[in-house]
Amino acid sequence: MSILNHFIFTFFLFCLGLFGIILNRQNIIIILMSIELLLLSINLNFIYFAVLIDDIIGQVFSLLILTVAAAESAIGLAIMIVFFKLYGDISIYKINLLSL
């Protein structure tokens, strides 16, 4: 596979995650999964270009992003569990009412 095929694949993943955020404003779990898909596509780009230029910095940076993404998803899921225990629903509209 050429680098263009890899770039098209990661661009497709990025667009899929972006459309998941834009089109689904009701379910916070799908929004969180779409954010993770965005981060995965960015990580794949870092790895592809690090292999292309034969440099390890892109792979190290990709591991750093994976660590931050894992922490972000763990914190997001913990907040959703607490919110569900308190209110019985994880609707975006109820979460937006908390900021008022």
UniProtKB/Swiss-Prot annotation:
Its EC number is 7.1.1.2. It is found in: Mitochondrion membrane. It catalyses: a ubiquinone + NADH + 5 H(+)(in) = a ubiquinol + NAD(+) + 4 H(+)(out). It is a multi-pass membrane protein. Its main location: mitochondrion. One of its GO terms (molecular function) is NADH dehydrogenase (ubiquinone) activity. One of its GO terms (biological process) is ATP synthesis coupled electron transport. One of its GO terms (cellular component) is NADH dehydrogenase complex. Core subunit of the mitochondrial membrane respiratory chain NADH dehydrogenase (Complex I) that is believed to belong to the minimal assembly required for catalysis. Complex I functions in the transfer of electrons from NADH to the respiratory chain. The immediate electron acceptor for the enzyme is believed to be ubiquinone. This is NADH-ubiquinone oxidoreductase chain 4L. The gene is ND4L.
